[in-house]
Swiss-Prot record:
This is Ribosomal RNA large subunit methyltransferase H. The lineage of its organism: Bacteria, Bacillati, Bacillota, Bacilli, Lactobacillales. It comes from the Bacteria. It is found in: Cytoplasm. GO terms for molecular function: rRNA (pseudouridine-N3-)-methyltransferase activity.
Length: 159
């Protein structure tokens, strides 16, 4: 199985890079986990709605180039479905049973995701109504992916 985390924006903080690298290493015994960073567009102060839509559309074009036609796409969006860790683990297991070998998680930029990406997604997923920095969300997501595999293994990590 191959998991891709497609993220808009560059990760700047060393402590987040270190945490993500640790979980990538842990995940390597279960799957290949690639993190793909895409350039984000600069958002001008007081950007109009139309300008924001253009920015999200440009970022969406970059995202689409990294999505495979046969990827199971999970886009993170505040309006998405909230899952408990056990449900998330079951979902990842079910995705592979259905014949998908590649799962792509998409984290948008500071403005969120363009509707075209949400439409392409097999699932919109939310980690709740909290607002988190997109860079921190990468660490939270990769930890939950690792946790999902540990749940499948019956590991005490989840306790």
């Amino acid at each position: 199985m191959k998991i891709k985390l497609i993220c808009v924006g560059k990760l700047k903080e060393a402590y987040l890079r270190d945490g993500i690298a640790e979980y990538q290493k842990r995940l390597s015994r279960f799957c290949q986990c690639d993190i793909i960073e895409l350039a984000d567009e600069k958002t001008p102060d007081k950007a109009s709605h139309a300008e924001k839509q253009q920015i999200m559309a440009k970022e969406a074009d970059r995202i689409k180039k990294k999505l495979g036609q046969r990827d199971f796409v999970i886009a993170l969006a505040i309006e998405g479905k909230q899952l408990a860790s056990e449900q998330f683990s079951h979902l990842l297991s079910e995705v592979t049973v259905k014949g998908y070998s590649d799962i792509a998680f998409v984290i948008g930029g500071s403005l969120g995701l363009d509707q075209s990406i949400k439409n392409r997604a097999n699932l919109l997923m939310s980690f709740g109504l909290l607002t988190l920095p997109h860079q921190l969300m990468r660490l939270v997501l990769i930890e939950q992916v690792y946790r999902a595999f540990m749940i499948q293994q019956g590991s005490p990590y989840h306790k």
